[in-house]
Amino acid sequence: MKKISGFFKAIGRYFKNFGVAFAKGDIWVKLSAVIMGAGYFARKQIVNGLIMLIVEAAFVLMCVGYAAPNLAKFGTLGTVKFEQVFDPLTMQTTTNNYDNSFQILLNSVVALFIILIFVLFYIHNIKTVYKLQQMKENGEHINTFKEDMKSLFNEKFHITLLTLPTIGVVIMNILILIAVAFTNYDQQHLPPNSLFTWVGFKNFASLFSNSMTVTFGYSFRKVLGWTLVWAVMATFTTFIGGILLAKAINSKTTKLPKMWRTLFIISIAVPQFVTLLLVRNFFADSGIVNTICSNIGITDMLKHAGLVGEHLTYIPFLTDPHWAKVMIILINIWVGVPYQMLIATGVLMNIPTDQIESAKIDGATNFQVFWKITMPYILFIQGPALITDFVKNINNFNVIYLLTQDVFVTQNQALANSHAKEVDLLVTWLFRLTNEYYDYKMASVIGIIVFIICAAFTLISFSRMISGDKEEEYQ
């Protein structure tokens, strides 16, 4: 809570400082509120002043020629439908000047974002000009344009490096995603032939409620539950498996450790989608594994144990919900453990040997050494990577999709009504909604939920992660 309150206090101070700068500034500061480059010209920063004038002029032109026409239609997202009329005189088909709802939405969001950036830029301009006034009054050195540019690649390089990726990849994608979630953009409202419009929180209500025809609420709970179970199991099974495999290979009693390590590295060299497609064929209902199991009596044994239906002549490795979930986790272990083994090998080779030797002299068993020394050290080093792996597994599209697409067919009608499956993650459900059913509105809502889950987990985990002040314990 302190960090949240501190965030809002920082915003308050930002605008307060702007008011102070404008109130206490000289005539050039106040003139900069109208002509943005005026304050820079007065302090002999000609290039900066020209840049400000160009930015201001470009913003005015953008507002008139780009923002205003689109924002005028932003409230309705268009009213003129697409129509084609055949002209018997010219024997040609003409198209009317129709509205494209998605283009209006996209252009409006971009325009609003540019306006927001300009407002922040405008405030920064006033505060900077006031700071230049104070520096001149105090006889301090005022940077030249060349010195300002150098600072962008030195002490301010982090701002230079992160600005464009943040705007282009994170902010714009998220803003469009959020906007679409409040519309009825789906297969019945596909531009340019149809228009879509705002529906408020109706899509969010659908995701958290049920009816006879709309079962998104039921499907969301089922898919979310499996997504979290999958993320936890996939992360920790490969993590622990990689550590145990690395310790086994690096053990003094293991013969030919280089050979074993090389064999597992070779499995990494094979493209993952090739491995997954081959494994899917191996475990298919008529695949080689089922053939072997049937011939040696394993299928009949599982029938007697009640693990396979009496009417089946095969083991439904990837076609039964329960079997499929177990197999997906096991196959992911096979795919993911070699990666973790390599990482764990590097960490294990850097554990201080004096700590381990001291513990053994004091009578510690191998398990105690592993649990009290090795694991804390590995968690300290790999903690951030473990968080990243968990988030990556929430969005792990390849494993689920390649193993179950065109193989697994849900028998749950409520899930089928929402185009979901028992083995779907939120991300594969989202993909199916957009790629196969063009239900962009619900896909956007699910995308927002995924983003909130990943962002919240990442922020909370990193805030509680082992901080740098404990680094000396592991040196």
Please name every model-derived segment:
Residues 2-31, 47, 52-156, 176:
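Transmembrane helix recognition focused on a "late"/terminal membrane span
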Residues 26, 44, 338-340:
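Positively charged, hydrophobic/aromatic-enriched amphipathic segments
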Residues 32-37:
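Hydrophobic, membrane-inserted alpha-helices
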Residues 39, 49, 63, 136-142, ...:
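Glycine-centered flexibility motif
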Residues 70-73, 159-475:
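A structural signal for multi-pass alpha-helical bundles of membrane permease subunits
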